[in-house]
């Protein structure tokens, strides 16, 4: 990150004009003096989310009434917080304290200005961001209300990319969001309100990736402040931390200097109560101790809450987090594609999903069907391994593959699966999987080891210290970026250690492709080989979110969707209503 003289700019595309597209939705132009790119080189804006939303539907009731300023909003904090956005299973307090450079629509992922007022393509390897002036960091030492400017933004880019790994004495793999901004070389503050990003190669998903909720910005001094004491944190977001008791209670109060969205935040304060037990959280909502609850991972609670809180509004949509079962390919048996494919053919995906989610789920192959490039749930259901009607035939092929790999009827196959023990859905899904394999292959030995919480799981799976792992993967707002993160040799979420040169080459080509049809064709090739030749992962199903909210709170219809904010971090956008 360097301060530079005023940039001499060439012909550019302004983000305010085509921001809905991200780089995935516009050709890189500006190399010559002409204005727009030819029509056939552009990627049209895709209505990400429409495909799956039409399959499952979106329920988002509008609460009538006038928004009222003030009041307190309380929700349950079930997961342990991890506070460095570059690493960990969540971004901790930062979605409350700070903001994203660009925002994506909750359903469509269409981009809109946020910290950046415009985003431009100067040439295939040069991106220009204009930062809104007047943004202030909270009035807390050492910042004391100083301006948040281009130098902070440039620092965030370089830190997310892992450029400071050596200086911080951290492994490059620590910076898990690096593949979100693949091909990043450097960021420079041209002036107080202009950032120039240089890429090593074109990246067709760079802009859309910046709307991922793990890409929260921070003041450039945060590495010096450290991430151990959240009471020292500050940002430009709608909230300030007023109280922090680890795993017990976090209280936020309104940041009076917040300026990005008029009137926000509406509430005076937000409280996250630490309730580790999902059933205790259900009881808290039933007794009106908390104002909203996400019961996606605890679907059996819905009938109870329908009785105890019949007044609550129900919001539901296709989640952006799929359930997966990932083999560690460094474990010898899983290096063999035949073993990995045999397990796929033996799994009864519908049995696992319906036992937990009833009918509130869909099939998926390599990423969520919200993406235009992804195969539809109907197509996936028709494929070997997924199709319930051909399960007996598929299991015969499974046995043949295992025998050819040296494990006749599963004999000699033994492994442990780790998961988050506090997730009832994960444990139930694994128990179902274990039972299926025991029925099909009685001599196969599968053990389940639930870990205490997400933080404990994160400490193990990010190092690849497992034989198989079950969890949930929250996708970024771009299909190519999602699969690069998870399956490219250099992918920052490639916890299973999968490495296939042909896959790497295909995805490297796809990320640099800006023609919509060509991009989709490349992704189609990827999905075909994922199904027939690679099988690095088992995406079990995609559940449907179910959130209940106190009826006097409005605004949730604006944050509901596959790429929405959720009951906790969306607090600045919701409000009490005067009816």
Per-segment meaning from a language model:
Residues 361-404, 422-428:
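Structural transition elements
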């Amino acid at each position: 990150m360097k301060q530079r003289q005023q940039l001499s700019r060439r012909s550019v595309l302004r983000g305010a004009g085509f921001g809905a597209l991200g780089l995935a939705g516009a050709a890189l132009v500006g190399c010559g003096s002409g204005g727009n790119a030819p029509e056939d080189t552009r990627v049209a804006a895709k209505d990400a989310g429409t495909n799956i939303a039409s399959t499952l539907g979106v329920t988002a009731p509008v609460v009538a009434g006038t928004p009222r300023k003030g009041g307190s909003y309380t929700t349950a904090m079930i997961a342990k917080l991890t506070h460095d956005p570059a690493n960990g299973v969540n971004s901790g307090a930062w979605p409350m304290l700070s903001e994203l450079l660009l925002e994506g629509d909750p359903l469509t992922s269409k981009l809109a200005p946020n910290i950046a007022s415009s985003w431009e393509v100067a040439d295939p390897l040069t991106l220009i961001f204009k930062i809104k002036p007047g943004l202030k960091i909270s009035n807390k030492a050492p910042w004391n209300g100083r301006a948040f400017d281009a130098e902070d933004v440039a620092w965030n880019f370089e830190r997310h990319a892992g450029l400071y790994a050596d200086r911080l004495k951290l492994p490059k793999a620590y910076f898990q969001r690096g593949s979100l901004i693949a091909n990043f070389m450097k960021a420079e503050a041209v002036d107080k309100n202009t950032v120039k990003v240089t890429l090593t190669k074109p990246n067709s998903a760079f802009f859309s990736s910046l709307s991922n909720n793990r890409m929260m910005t921070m003041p450039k001094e945060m590495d010096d402040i450290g991430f151990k004491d959240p009471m020292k944190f500050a940002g430009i977001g709608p909230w300030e931390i007023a109280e922090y008791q680890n795993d017990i209670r976090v209280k936020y109060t309104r940041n009076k200097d917040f300026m990005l969205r008029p009137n926000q935040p509406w509430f005076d304060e937000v409280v996250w109560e630490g309730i580790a037990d999902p059933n205790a959280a259900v009881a808290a909502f039933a007794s009106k101790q908390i104002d909203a609850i996400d019961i996606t991972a605890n679907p059996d609670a819905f009938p109870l809450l329908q009785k105890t809180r019949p007044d609550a509004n129900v919001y539901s949509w296709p989640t952006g987090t799929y359930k997966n079962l990932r083999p560690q390919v460094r474990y010898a048996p899983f290096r063999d594609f035949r073993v990995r494919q045999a397990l796929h053919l033996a799994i009864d995906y519908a049995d696992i999903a319906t036992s937990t989610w009833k009918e509130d789920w869909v099939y998926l192959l390599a990423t969520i069907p919200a993406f235009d490039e992804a195969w539809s749930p109907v197509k996936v259901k028709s494929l070997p391994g997924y199709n319930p009607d051909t399960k007996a035939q598929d299991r015969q092929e499974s046995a043949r593959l295992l025998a050819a790999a040296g494990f006749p009827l599963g004999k000699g196959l033994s492994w442990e699966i780790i998961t988050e023990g506090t997730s009832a859905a994960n444990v139930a899904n694994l128990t179902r999987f274990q039972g299926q394999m025991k029925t099909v292959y009685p001599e196969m030995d599968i053990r389940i080891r639930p870990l205490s919480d997400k933080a404990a799981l994160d400490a193990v799976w990010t190092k690849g210290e497992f034989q198989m792992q079950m969890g949930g993967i929250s996708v970024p707002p771009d299909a190519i970026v999602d699969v690069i993160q998870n399956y490219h040799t250099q992918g920052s979420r490639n916890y299973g250690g999968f490495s296939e040169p042909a896959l790497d080459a295909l995805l490297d080509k796809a990320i640099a492709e800006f023609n919509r049809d060509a991009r989709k064709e490349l992704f189609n090739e990827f999905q075909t080989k994922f199904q027939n030749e690679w099988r690095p992962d088992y995406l079990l199903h995609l559940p449907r979110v179910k959130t209940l909210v106190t009826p006097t709170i409005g605004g949730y219809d604006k944050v509901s969707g596959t790429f929405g904010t959720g009951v906790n971090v969306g607090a600045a956008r919701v409000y009490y209503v005067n009816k």
